[in-house]
Design a protein with these regions (language model features):
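Rossmann-fold cofactor-recognition segment
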Residues: 42-55
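Short loop/helix-cap segments at secondary-structure boundaries that form the rim of catalytic
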Residues: 37-44, 61
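Oxidoreductase cofactor-interface core, primarily capturing Rossmann-like NAD(P)-dependent enzymes
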Residues: 1-36, 54-57, 64, 75-83, ...
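A hydrophobic C-terminal alpha-helical subdomain
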Residues: 215, 227-285
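Compositionally biased, low-complexity linear motifs
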Residues: 63-67, 284-285
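Residues lining the SAM
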Residues: 5, 72, 270
């Protein structure tokens, strides 16, 4: 049985949908924190069990009978994130999974300027020593994050953010389809995958130009000093660790950490990945 964690989240839910295009429902199980949100999956024949990355006993039940486990990384920074990933990896191995698959990041590195990428690197190190075959999906930066950063500008026309660099913004839907393809073809990749990215890298200046072309309204890209951006986030009530995490996106982008483009994603899904311009057009429609 293939177990998918976080199956009511954006990436996990879409991965299950695409996986059901490839394998029978009785071969798919999900581990979720709230079973009620997964009732539509249960109705389709998917096994639904409660599992939490902070509760190894719940994971033992959720992962029972697993041949593969897809561990969708948590939306946290730092040691807490790494510890939760460790708990999930150890539970998957203990359950007898033949392979552990993990949603990592294209820029995973202990030297990254972005905390989440350092966390992914630490998790990959745990995977390397876990005693089971593993695959680390080196996912491109989620396109949804670009749209969130751009959100306030859609009304004001002012893209006021710290200086950035080119990023291979990549759609959840494409990454979910790739994950499903890899799970259905067990062992296709061993260890870290090549970067799973869109076909072009864009800056927020590029996004401002795209938004202007789509809407016919002017959009101005203004570089906000880092300390000013930090202060704005703090004044908005963003926790200090989150402030530094968000700032890390820009400092890492300036260093070119997210600029890589690779054909692997297109090969996996059998078509060109969704371009961020299409996502932006949908957002502005």
């Amino acid at each position: 049985m293939i177990i998918v964690t976080g199956a009511t989240g954006r990436l996990g839910r879409q991965t299950v949908d695409r996986l059901l295009d490839r394998v029978p429902a009785h071969r798919v199980g999900v581990s979720v924190r709230d079973q009620r949100k997964a009732e539509p999956l249960r109705a389709r024949g998917v096994r639904v069990r409660e599992g939490c990355f902070t509760d190894s006993e719940s994971l033992a039940h959720a992962f029972e009978g697993a041949t593969q486990v897809l561990i969708v990384s948590v939306d946290q920074f730092g040691e807490e994130a790494v510890q939760q990933h460790r708990t999930a990896i150890e539970a998957a191995v203990k359950a007898g999974a033949r392979r552990v698959v993990y949603t990592s990041h294209m820029a995973a590195s202990p030297a990254s300027r972005f905390q989440a990428c350092r966390d992914h690197a630490a998790t990959e190190e745990i995977l390397r020593s876990c005693g089971a075959p593993y695959t680390a999906l080196r996912n491109g930066f989620y396109a949804a994050s670009a749209l969130q950063f751009l959100g306030p500008a859609l009304d004001s026309g002012q893209v006021a953010l710290p200086e950035d660099g080119p990023v291979s913004w990549t759609a959840h839907a494409d990454l979910a389809e790739a994950a499903a393809a890899i799970l259905a073809d067990e062992g296709r990749y061993d260890g870290p995958t090549p970067p799973l990215t869109a076909t072009r890298s864009l800056t927020f200046g590029d996004l401002a130009t795209l938004a202007a072309g789509i809407t016919g309204r002017p959009f101005t890209r203004t570089a906000v000093p880092d300390d000013v951006y930090r202060r704005h986030l703090a004044e908005a009530g963003v926790p200090a660790d989150r402030v530094e995490g968000l700032m890390g996106v820009f400092t890492a982008a300036r260093a070119g950490e997210f600029a890589a483009q690779d054909p692997t994603l297109a090969a996996l899904i059998g078509r060109a990945p969704v371009d961020l311009a299409a996502s932006l057009r949908e957002q502005l429609a």
